């Protein structure tokens, strides 16, 4: 076998031995500021604002593959009772983990979350980028009233 063929074969074997790489995460890498948090119902497209019309938050995607999100609902105030403190949980979304991009989805393996049931799970989100806007869509899930809904969360690239 000629040296050139040997190197070509070695290169091919090396390439095939590499793990499958996910889509390029570069478009979502960075810091994004929350614009809106809506719940959309599948039947009829009705939308509501479970975090209020002016929630606050950020989502960060690092090039190393770590993401973090913190979202708080509109009108949160300092708690004065245990009941107040417990109520704040209903207006908080916070988690972090390792993410990968696969097509139009990012999938995060959570290692920390305000919701302990999410720790160790994979959370998949569909997304699209339009200019400086990032729109995140959760999977459709059945609400307590059995209607199917998802969160549609919009961010803009932070300056």
PLM region spans:
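Lipid interaction determinants
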Residues: 9-13, 18-159
